[in-house]
A protein has these predicted regions:
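Alpha-helical coupling/stalk and coiled-coil linker elements that connect catalytic or binding modules
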Residues: 1-251, 259-260, 264-287, 310
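ATPase nucleotide-binding head domains, primarily ABC-like/P-loop NTPase cores
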Residues: 65, 201-431
Length: 431
């Protein structure tokens, strides 16, 4: 199906236009669960509602012959409207799901009518035929419910028809019908979902400069050729053979955080939509764990450092001998002082080295590359600063970075000269 929509632009565009009307309504995510639990969605006996209808109609007709019977008609109207309101309040959510049931069926009908369902055209037609007139059975009830929220007139008509209990009877009939057609409906839902996913992936692939389908192997490694970040315009691609735990160092804004995010994104894309933004991508299947873009939480009283500690602990608790864990960490323990950060980071990374995991860490701490030399491989990004400009090539190089650019950036951004001079002196003293 994916190949079909990659190659056939016209059916893809038609299907996209139809699927837009389906939208991203939150209730759609719960439709399969609703259909699987229809037994709990019955609103009562149709016979009971029919009896109340007959009593109301009988009292009205009788009142035309004998005025003394009219009060009974009023009582029955009050009883019916009370039954309607209480039942509707109790089952409002379930009744609203019926509107989404119809929406999915209508989407399937439009896809088949426009002949843009590709490889699943026949399957959709068969499922729609099996479902029969379910959409018409529900359609009028759904339209009336929508109108009841749109105007005062709609509210009045809702209560007027509520007296007849027509909506409750229609809903109960729909539930019983859907129970008998449960499998057909769920298969229709799944096929439309697969079609939607295939179009999304095909459209994503068309938007990329180039892509590849991943290759999975049994080696504990990830091989990336000319890989890039999919959200960057005119991205710079890099290659890497990642078979050992590694530390990525680099100056500010040199590209290390973007690189590790690109790695994480492609690891996820490879195992979900079989698409990688690279010339070639090989990997061992595994769970992906990240600690990046950490933020404090004022409402919960959690500092940046505490949040990061929770992220890292979650990683450590996920390790198992049965499944490889691939960990990607941006600026490890950034939220604490330098001395303790380096000590704690080394201890954590030493522990990870002994586990069934593959680790990539981005860090400003050159000291870590020295302390972990021999156990962690080193890569870096760098830059070139002139008198009036700064140039980043965003290329990944082997080895650890040997210099920073923070003080150079102070000068480049035209900070007062005395600040730049003092910063240089302080660095010299510490070295």
């Amino acid at each position: 199906m994916l190949k079909y929509y990659e190659e056939q632009a016209e059916p893809r565009k038609k299907a996209e236009a139809i699927l837009i009307s389906l939208g991203k309504r939150e209730g759609l995510y719960y439709l399969p669960e609703y259909v699987d639990t229809l037994q709990a969605s019955h609103v009562g006996s149709v016979f009971f509602y029919r009896l109340l209808q007959i009593l109301l109609l009988g009292s009205v007709v009788g009142g035309l012959w004998n005025v003394q019977i009219l009060p009974l008609a009023g009582v029955m109207a009050i009883v019916n409207i009370a039954v309607y309101i209480m039942t509707r309040m109790k089952y409002e959510q379930q009744m609203s799901m019926m509107e989404l049931i119809v929406l999915v069926i209508d989407t399937g009908k439009q896809l088949t009518k426009e002949k843009c369902a590709g490889p699943v055209q026949k399957e959709l037609e068969e499922k729609l035929k099996e479902l029969g007139k379910l959409d018409k059975l529900i359609g009028k009830m759904s339209a009336m419910r929508r109108n009841s929220y749109s105007s005062d007139q709609g509210v009045f008509l809702d209560y007027l028809f509520g007296i007849t209990l027509w909506q409750l009877i229609s809903y109960e009939k729909s539930v019983k019908w859907l129970e008998n057609k449960r499998e057909s409906y769920l298969q229709l839902f799944e096929e439309i979902g697969r079609l939607d996913a295939a179009i999304s992936i095909a459209s994503f692939r068309k938007s990329l400069p180039f892509y590849t389908e991943p290759e999975f192997h049994s080696e504990r490694s990830v091989h990336m050729e000319e890989m890039y970040h999919p959200l960057i315009e005119e991205p710079v691609s890099n290659s890497m053979d990642w078979s050992r735990n590694c530390i990525i160092t680099g100056s500010n804004a040199s590209g290390k955080s973007t690189w590790i995010k690109a790695v994480a994104i492609n690891l996820i894309l490879a195992q979900t939509i079989c698409t990688c933004t690279a010339k070639r991508f090989q990997m061992h299947p595994g769970q992906i764990m990240t600690s990046m873009a950490v933020r404090d939480d004022i409402m919960k009283g959690e500092s940046y450092f505490l949040k990061e500690m929770k992220y890292l602990r979650r990683m450590l608790e996920s390790f198992s001998e049965e499944k490889l864990t691939i960990c990607i960490i941006d600026e490890i323990l950034k939220g604490t002082n330098t001395k303790e950060r380096i000590a704690a980071s080394k201890a954590i990374l030493d522990y990870m080295q002994r586990q069934n995991c593959l680790v990539m860490v981005a860090s400003h701490d050159y000291e870590l590359t020295v302390l972990l030399e021999g156990t962690y491989e080193n890569y870096h990004f760098t830059e070139r600063i002139g008198e009036d400009d700064i140039y980043f090539d965003y290329r990944l190089y082997p080895g650890a970075v040997t210099s920073g650019n923070a003080i150079k950036l102070l000068k480049f951004m035209k900070f007062p000269e005395e600040i730049v001079t003092e910063a240089k002196q302080q660095v010299t003293i510490e070295l």
